[in-house]
Amino acid sequence: VRTPAEIRDEYIDSLNHIRSAYGKICGQVGRGHLLSFPDIHKLSEGLFLSALTYWEALCRDLIVTDLATVSAGVLRSEIREFRTKNAPYRLAERMLNHPDHPEKFVEWSSFESVVSRANEFLGQNHRYVLTQVEKQDLAKIKKVRNAIAHKSDKAWESFSALIRGDPFNLTGAQCRGVTPGRFIYAHQWNGATVMEKSLTTLENAARTLVP
């Protein structure tokens, strides 16, 4: 069983691997190199999704660990002794999963959903507290993720509104032909590429949850 610090460190290691891979492929783009711009856009989408998938796993694994170990949580406050060492972790996972799991699942990509479950199962003094700016940035990242993962009209409309609004402010001409991968690779977010800023935001959030 991993500690919260181990869960955080494994996640940050994953982000560092993604950063390294992204840096390498960015150096192989254009004339005379291995990758075309459409190639780098698709690869950027894949790495971006990987970072978000690991983030979802971090949130899920952290809250399961907290529910299994924190005395103020509903599990430990109701049950003093367990038959086996790992029983609280198995019970915590079942309690936090969707009732119809695995056919349906909790949307761990939504931090608000994580906070809601923490409030319900862990009480008010839990670790799942981020600044308003951090939560807004995670919401932006989630919209990009949804545009890659879902391909639905709703996801695309949300993505289009995002890139036209602050802080990206893409013009109509810039939006023409844009894809999530092209946006991640080619556009800036507070002085860094969208990919770089997103990875930094996710790492900072992980360090806030587990100092």
Where do the PLM segments sit?
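Polyanionic, low-complexity intrinsically disordered segments
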Residues: R2-G27, V133-Q136, V144, H150-P211
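Short, Lys/Arg-rich flexible segments
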Residues: K24-L35, I40
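Helix-loop junctions and short alpha-helical segments
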Residues: L34, I40-V144
